Amino acid sequence: MDRPPPDQQRQKQAPLFSPYQMPRFRLNHRVVLAPMTRCRAIGGVPGPALAEYYAQRTTQGGLLISEGTVVSPAGPGFPHVPGIYNQEQTDAWKKVVDAVHAKGGIFFCQLWHVGRASHQVYQPNGAAPISSTDKPISARWRILMPDGSYGKYPKPRRLAASEIPEIVEQYRQAAINAIEAGFDGIEIHGAHGYIIDQFLKDGINDRTDEYGGSLSNRCRFLLEVTRAVVSAIGADRVAVRISPAIDHLDAYDSDPIKLGMAVVERLNALQQQSGRLAYLHVTQPRYTAYGQTESGQHGSAEEESRLMRTLRGTYQGTFMCSGGYTRELGLEAVESGDADLVSYGRLFISNPDLVERFRLNAGLNKYVRKTFYTPDPVVGYTDYPFLGQPKSRM
């Protein structure tokens, strides 16, 4: 059994483990479960395995963010990802949310649409995926197919400007469904090369209409989605995630700081009208959505730090960071004021009691990458041991 070190009491008082007041919710600590695709919602409907998985990772007054949950039938780009666009899915999520609330957790639903990061096999009637562009994702990247193999990303269909309001409405309705399911709020996934990021980044967005070209135009879709969701459920239940300096799925921008600042300034203006958002969630440049750590994708570590601190210093509200954080980096980020909250992904996969392990500075279970995206409801999902339990045999 792992034993806590002598400085256990001092670590319990560290800022990472101190309470935090969000606009609507009070947290008991600053360690957040990051949104992570796990491919266990068979047929797009969350089942008992998801309820157990999230409940295992719940602490009293802790914030959890669900895996990416698609807002329409055209939204998926992985097998067995959950949706929240119909009544069956909404009702199924209620049981998962109830399991989290029963343990005192605060639960946000991440609203997701992958855009061009999909394949005809995931699309209604085998249609081409939709995007801001008709450029496909390069052969550098591969898509996970339903049979577990990997394939090439196909050429997407460029959305007409007249089609975009329908997608905005899908986000709005999904947010309403999330609140009906009992979620405490939602996070708009505007990061990691998915559909909103496909409008934000000038390396993808080659449009010449009101949704392309200038920074203002490239930010338009995100702002329309955010305003629609805020009008439906209230600003203090709405969060936004961005990753201006990450080129995952070819989502490259020529000036990440300028892009990040453009988003932040517009969110600040929105907050002046609608009230404070729940938080802004920014992924550190060293992270990619496939779990790789790549420091310096867009420059030196100093430049990456400058980006995060610039956004932190400009955004008027709760600032959450993520991307390859260790316990020590999380302690430092909160203590230095670089972030209010820190979200953890892979470490939470293999350590359902991560918050307690961090408090005690206890040892951590190692995650098994090959089980990240498998449909097994137990192995690599709910069978990682808690402190004091025998080690997993995986």
UniProtKB/Swiss-Prot annotation:
GO molecular function (one): 12-oxophytodienoate reductase activity
Pathway membership, UniProt: Lipid metabolism; oxylipin biosynthesis
Record EC number: 1.3.1.42
Biological process, per Gene Ontology: jasmonic acid biosynthetic process; oxylipin biosynthetic process; response to fungus; response to ozone; stamen development
Location in the cell: Peroxisome
Induction behaviour: By wounding, jasmonate and drought stress.
Cellular component GO terms held in the UniProt record: peroxisome
Membrane is among the record's keywords: no
Binding site for FMN: 35-37, 110, 241, 324, 345-346
Entries under Pfam families matching the protein: Oxidored_FMN
Record field: catalytic activity: (1S,2S)-OPC-8 + NADP(+) = (9S,13S,15Z)-12-oxophyto-10,15-dienoate + NADPH + H(+)
Record note on disruption phenotype: Open glumes after anthesis associated with a delayed cell degradation process of the lodicules. Reduced grain filling.
EC primary class: oxidoreductase
Family designation: Belongs to the NADH:flavin oxidoreductase/NADH oxidase family.
General remark: Over-expression of OPR7 in Arabidopsis thaliana opr3 mutant functionally complements the male sterility phenotype and restores jasmonate production.
Protein's job: Involved in the biosynthesis of jasmonate (JA) and perhaps in biosynthesis or metabolism of other oxylipin signaling moleclules. In vitro, reduces cis(+)-12-oxophytodienoic acid (cis(+)-OPDA) and cis(-)-OPDA to cis(+)-OPC-8:0 and cis(-)-OPC-8:0, respectively. May be required for the spatial and temporal regulation of JA levels during dehiscence of anthers, promoting the stomium degeneration program. Involved in carbohydrate transport underlying normal lodicule function during anthesis.
PANTHER family, A to Z: 12-OXOPHYTODIENOATE REDUCTASE 3 (PTHR22893:SF112), NADH OXIDOREDUCTASE-RELATED (PTHR22893)
Protein's recorded name: 12-oxophytodienoate reductase 7
Gene: OPR7
